[in-house]
Curated annotation (Swiss-Prot):
Organism in which the protein naturally occurs: Archaeoglobus fulgidus (strain ATCC 49558 / DSM 4304 / JCM 9628 / NBRC 100126 / VC-16)
Protein name (database record): Uncharacterized protein AF_2225
One BP term from GO: small molecule metabolic process
Residues where a divalent metal cation binds: 97, 99, 128
InterPro entries in alphabetical order: FAH, Fumarylacetoacetase-like_C, Fumarylacetoacetase_C_sf
């Protein structure tokens, strides 16, 4: 695993292992209960992909896109594991969207699909939080996708040889609301790295969010949302209304 975390009042960054209830880092063992995971990277940009699961396209009764549909989320929206998703007053419907995220290893441009794996640092969980009513109102996605706290990322980066058959599910208050597999991606991870890098330079630490499966839905004040991906782990966040509590410990 790769990532950033706080333990004993200090910030650590690098490679570590999780052994049961312990985090093992540079020869030291720290109870996971004493660890606060930070966002594993601070990307220069987040490139997200719309309508990239077959089951999600079927759910919306929309045709499969001929090429990836790209949009951006700002790095200022990033939060980590156990941080709070702030539900803005201006929106009456904020949705979860559990996703697999690809973390770029080094600066790259025009990467061939066959070489894409060489430029991937690893994979992590992502939640493409969206103010759905604003998305519909605006007719484009920037405002709806860009509020602070609307890009939960983590808890850490896993190095995975084959990301093509990973189980993915999202839970709200313990109830499974999304369940799929990355084998249902319309454009796979390597296709996405190649396509995105043909459009823009990818910087080390940049994130490509690969799209969400069927089952997106609304978050309410106090909801606990978890995105779990096979071979990676669980990203957990709590939704909080901004008029109730601006800063929270959760």
């Amino acid at each position: 695993m790769l990532g950033r975390f706080v333990a004993n009042g200090r910030i650590y960054e690098g490679s570590f292992e999780i052994d049961g209830e312990l985090l093992v880092f540079d020869g030291y063992e720290v109870p996971l209960t004493a660890v606060k995971f930070l966002p594993p990277v601070v990307p220069s940009k987040i490139i997200a992909v719309g309508l990239n699961y077959i089951d999600h396209a079927e759910e919306l009764n929309m045709p499969v896109p001929e090429e990836p549909i790209l949009f951006m989320k700002p790095s200022t929206a990033v939060i980590g594991h156990d941080d709070c998703i702030i539900l803005p007053q201006i929106s009456q419907r904020v949705d979860y969207e559990g996703e697999l995220a690809v973390v770029i290893a080094e600066d790259c441009r025009n990467v061939p699909e066959t070489n894409a794996a060489d430029y991937i640092l690893g994979y992590t969980c992502f939640n493409d939080v969206t103010a759905r009513d604003l998305q519909a109102k605006d007719g484009q996605w920037t405002r709806a996708k860009s509020f602070d706290t609307f890009a939960p990322l983590g808890p850490y980066i896993a190095e995975i040889d084959d990301p093509s058959k990973l189980g993915i599910q999202t839970r709200v208050n313990g109830k499974v609301v999304q369940k799929s597999n990355t084998s249902n991606l319309i454009f796979d991870v390597f296709q996405l790295v190649s396509f995105v890098s043909s459009v823009m330079t990818l910087k080390a630490g940049d994130v490509i969010a690969t799209g969400t499966p069927a089952g997106v839905g609304m978050l309410k004040d106090g909801d606990v949302v978890e995105v779990e991906i096979e071979k990676i782990g669980i990203l957990r966040n709590t939704a909080v209304k901004i008029d109730r509590q601006i800063r929270c410990e959760c």
